[in-house]
Amino acid sequence: NLIQFGNMISAMTGKSSLAYASYGCYCGWGGKGQPKDDTDRCCFVHDCCYGKADKCSPKMILYSYKFHNGNIVCGDKNACKKKVCECDRVAAICFAASKHSYNKNLWRYPSSKCTGTAEKC
């Protein structure tokens, strides 16, 4: 769920998950246009992943995971829980890998500036 996702983000990036809650064109609710940078692209991919797991209620479902040697390990056998955990795990790793691209000017970015044709998932 979103709280667990936030905990993964904080653990992997050392930043508050709120730094990613309203960033670029895809971090936060909804999304349109072209991703603005690598960090925003992580959110685009995460949105696509949640879209594929939509029947699982990805924003609400509780799953199990742990941190092991600096990695996130998803622990559920349940297919829905595992799928959503994997979406969140991959995004948190992506944020950590793209920390260099984080641009404070893209936090609370106006959606009116999110233009261009959106890519397909």
Curated annotation (Swiss-Prot):
- Tell me its family: Belongs to the phospholipase A2 family. Group II subfamily. D49 sub-subfamily.
Q: Name one GO cellular component term.
A: extracellular region
Q: Which reaction does it catalyse?
A: a 1,2-diacyl-sn-glycero-3-phosphocholine + H2O = a 1-acyl-sn-glycero-3-phosphocholine + a fatty acid + H(+)
Q: Does the keyword Hydrolase apply?
A: yes
S-S bonds = 25-114, 27-43, 42-94, 48-121, 49-87, 56-80, 74-85
**PANTHER family recorded for this chain?**
PHOSPHOLIPASE A2, PHOSPHOLIPASE A2 FAMILY MEMBER
| Residue positions of the active site | 46, 88
Write out the GO MF terms.
calcium ion binding; calcium-dependent phospholipase A2 activity; phospholipid binding; toxin activity
Q: What is this protein called?
A: Basic phospholipase A2 caudoxin
CDD domains according to UniProt: PLA2c
What SMART domains has UniProt attached to this entry? PA2c (SM00085)
Identify the residues that bind Ca(2+).
26, 28, 30, 47
Q: What's the top EC group for this one?
A: hydrolase
